Every structure is written in structure tokens, then in C-alpha cells.
Amino acid sequence: MSWLSLIFGEKKSTASVAKERLQLIIAHERVGLSGRDFLPDLQKDLVAVISKYVKIDPDDIKVGLEKQGNYEVIEVNIVLPEMR
């Protein structure tokens, strides 16, 4: 390895650069397409798991997705029955 390659780095082939870019584009599109599609399944899973431990009404669990700045936040609200 020459000292020039240490300074400027190894030159990548155009095919490998194109492949990396395509992988990034595909990953970004997958995230964009499935953004809110998973929420109903997540809600069903939460109902199933919580129902193992506490008797709840499935309508008492609300799942939402909201954007806060650069982040997407999953908000989960669960109304639990009063414990005696």
C-alpha cells in the first residue's frame, strides 16, 4: 500500500459504489413503505401479551406513530383495570 492510498484511500470500482447506493435506496424505500403498516400487528401482539397477565379489553390499547423532529416515536397507551 503506497502512502498516496493511505491519504486518499483506495479507489472503489463504480460497480461496488453503485451497488452500495442501490442497497441504501432499497433500504430507505422499505422503511418508508412499511412505516405505519406494522401498527395494527403491533397492537394485536400487545393485546395478546398483556392478556396473559391482566384481563383487558382490546379496545383499551391504542398504538400510534408520531414524528418529533427527526425521530418517529411509537406511542402506546394502555388502560389497565384497577387492582383491588
Swiss-Prot record:
Transmembrane segments: none
Keywords: Cell cycle, Cell division
Gene Ontology BP terms: cell division; regulation of division septum assembly
Keyword match Cell cycle: yes
Disulfide bonds, paired cysteine numbers: none
UniProt KW Amino-acid biosynthesis keyword: no
NCBIfam families: minE, PRK00296.1, PRK13989.1
Role played: Prevents the cell division inhibition by proteins MinC and MinD at internal division sites while permitting inhibition at polar sites. This ensures cell division at the proper site by restricting the formation of a division septum at the midpoint of the long axis of the cell.
Record-stated family: Belongs to the MinE family.
Name listed for the protein in its UniProt record: Cell division topological specificity factor
Organism of derivation: Thiobacillus denitrificans (strain ATCC 25259 / T1)
